[in-house]
Amino acid sequence: MKKIIAAAAIAAFAQSAAAEEFDLNINSDAVRGALSGPLSRVFSGVTGQYDAGLIYKKGENDSPDPKDTDLTLGHFGVLATGDVGAKGAEAGAGLGVRAVFADRGSATGAALALGGQFELRMPGFERLGLSGYGYFAPGILSFSDLKSYSEYALDVEFEVVRAAAIYAGYRRVNVKPEPNGPSNADDGAHLGLRLSF
């Protein structure tokens, strides 16, 4: 399953080589890569934004804690995006759906998650930004070994040049393979880089 998820993510990335934004972040045991851009680059004539990404977390094989198992999580989502109309601030948001494919230890599954994202920049401090996203799939929208899924993150970024920003943030991923099992699959701070094309 890990090979299938990785191949699907690479194929999505390759087809969208002209994406508007490439995002990569790391922490001590996980890496997340994502591409996002106008949905019309994937499906001609369609408005909105696409978002494709992959998280890989290396588990600790000798740990008795179930949350320390390997995690491979891929997603592809679509969002309706726009300006939120905040006076005196540059603020945008999006709402949409995300198809998620997860492989955690011996459990594999999929989910259809609902959620959204936001980005905020204040006038006079345009180089500083606050952004975040959150997605949730309850049991009714989770399939195979996956009983529920949620993922959220919050980042503070500094725009080094117009096409590149660095950021620090926090992300939590909950992938629940059993009704009463552990759900926390990735949790912690990260450092990242965003490149716009």
Q: Model segments located where?
A:
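Context-gated lysine
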Residues: 2-3, 57-58, 67, 87, ...
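General helical structural elements
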Residues: 6-7, 45, 61, 102, ...
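Gram-negative bacterial Sec-dependent N-terminal signal peptides
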Residues: 1-18
